[in-house]
């Protein structure tokens, strides 16, 4: 193409031709042409780079204003020569450069493959074989699969991992060991599969469950953004990562969480006698843990440990503090009933039920779920007008009339804060 736009580049041989010279004795095939030749930079870029992007060159030439009809019609696939030859030598001379010779044989190796394999497997030895391929269709992905030179140490173990194929999306690691990518009998293969089409979203059910929390909704009303840390490992990471880019990470379930407030709200809090948080929301109640101690997620993880330290659980699972909205009609009615009769069992049931329900809504667990269920049964019977002393009632509710904590006093405080 350059010779057509600038004929002076063919001054040394204006008659374009290609000669094929076979040599049966030396088993060689020589191809001679009278082209414009290549410079040293051309040899490095065009012949020394195997993965040179022709699409990128096409776009650059097209943006420069070249004739689109002449792009991509002068290449015959240089590396197809290695399908019949063990060594290829190119001798070329460009008008603006010296004569150079480029030579390559099939005995070469891929250094970048070796370095990538060692960094991927933490192995000091080279691989035995490699397969690099791409798949296009409904789901497009690229894969690097390596066969190790030696069998893995855990090959015959009964509790070994099924495979060690890493799955990534847009070069972001998604899974360290994706079992669905390769059969179990090929678990000795190491590699990476990368796709541009994999979604990077968490399960919507889990996200919606966290988003419906009354604590999160309260932050949204203040116009604050919330980071969802729903995976078990997130709890450990956040405990070590105290801040990010100068911003302190704060758990929304902590008691010392401070939110923006106006002057009127500050004044109302100072005058109030009950413990409330910065801004009243539409929720009837919520539950927050104390400043020091485990969050609800961390408490659930630690209680699931078979070899946990029970002494640590005692003080790390600290007191829970019930936060209420004193302006809500339910709280106001409950207060009036308590003032009328402090020994009313229904009031005591409602107070404890309110606290236990707040624990559940804040992802804390209940030590006695059956007691909680029986308390709900009693409130249902009260709502239906059923006499609790009716002999036809099931024995379960009667048997569950556990000792009710008094409405006031130290015993009630310890029960609520335990």
From Swiss-Prot:
Start and end residues of each stretch annotated as Disordered: 255-289, 383-418
Subcellular location: Cytoplasm
Matching Pfam families: HATPase_c_3, HSP90
SUPFAM superfamilies linked: ATPase domain of HSP90 chaperone/DNA topoisomerase II/histidine kinase (SSF55874), HSP90 C-terminal domain (SSF110942), Ribosomal protein S5 domain 2-like (SSF54211)
Keyword ATP-binding appears in the UniProt entry: yes
Bias (Basic and acidic residues) ranges: 265-274
InterPro entries membership: HATPase_C_sf, HSP90_C, Hsp90_fam, Hsp90_N, Ribosomal_Su5_D2-typ_SF
Keywords noted in UniProt: ATP-binding, Chaperone, Cytoplasm, Nucleotide-binding, Stress response
GO CC annotations on file: cytoplasm
Binding site for ATP: 33, 52, 78, 204
Any one GO molecular-function label of the UniProt entry: unfolded protein binding
Family statement: Belongs to the heat shock protein 90 family.
Functional note: Putative molecular chaperone that may promote the maturation, structural maintenance and proper regulation of specific target proteins.
Subunit annotation: Homodimer.
Name of the protein this chain belongs to: Putative heat shock protein HSP 90-alpha A4
Protein source organism: Homo sapiens (Human)
Gene: HSP90AA4P
């Amino acid at each position: 193409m350059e010779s057509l736009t600038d004929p002076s580049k063919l001054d040394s041989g204006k008659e374009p031709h290609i000669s094929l010279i076979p040599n049966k004795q030396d088993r060689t095939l020589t191809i001679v042409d009278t082209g414009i030749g290549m410079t040293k930079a051309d040899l490095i870029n065009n012949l020394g780079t195997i993965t040179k992007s022709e699409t990128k060159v096409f776009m650059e030439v097209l943006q420069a204003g070249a004739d689109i009809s002449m792009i991509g019609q002068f290449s015959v696939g240089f590396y197809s020569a290695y399908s019949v030859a063990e060594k290829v030598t190119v001798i070329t001379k460009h008008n603006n450069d010296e004569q150079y010779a480029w030579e390559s044989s099939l005995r070469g190796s891929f250094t970048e493959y070796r370095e990538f394999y060692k960094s991927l497997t933490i192995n000091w030895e080279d691989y035995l074989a490699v397969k690099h391929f791409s798949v296009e269709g409904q789901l497009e992905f690229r894969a690097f699969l390596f066969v190790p030179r030696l069998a893995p140490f855990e090959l015959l173990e009964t509790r070994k991992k099924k495979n060690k194929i890493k799955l990534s999306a847009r070069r972001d690691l998604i899974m360290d060991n994706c079992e669905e990518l390769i059969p179990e009998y090929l678990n000795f293969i190491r590699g990476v599969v990368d796709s541009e089409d994999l979604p990077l979203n968490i399960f919507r059910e889990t996200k919606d469950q966290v988003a419906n929390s009354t604590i999160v909704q309260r932050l949204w009303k203040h116009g604050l953004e919330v980071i969802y840390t729903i995976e078990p490992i997130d709890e450990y990471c956040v405990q070590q990562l105290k801040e990010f880019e100068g911003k302190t990470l704060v758990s929304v379930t902590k008691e010392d969480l401070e939110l923006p407030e106006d002057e009127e709200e500050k004044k109302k809090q100072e005058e109030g006698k009950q413990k409330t948080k910065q801004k009243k929301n539409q929720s009837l109640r919520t539950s927050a843990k104390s400043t020091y101690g485990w969050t609800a997620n961390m408490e659930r993880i630690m209680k699931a440990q078979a070899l946990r330290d029970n002494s640590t659980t005692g003080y790390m699972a600290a007191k829970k503090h019930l936060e209420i909205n004193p302006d809500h009609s339910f709280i106001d009615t409950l207060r009036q009933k308590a003032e009328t009769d402090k020994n009313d069992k229904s009031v005591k049931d409602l107070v404890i039920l309110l606290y236990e329900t707040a624990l559940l809504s804040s992802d804390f667990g209940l030590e006695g779920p059956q007691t909680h269920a029986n308390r709900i049964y009693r409130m249902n019977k009260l709502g239906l007008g059923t006499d609790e002393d009716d002999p036809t009632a099931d024995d379960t509710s009667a048997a569950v009339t556990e000792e009710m904590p008094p409405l006031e006093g130290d015993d009630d405080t310890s029960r609520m804060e335990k």
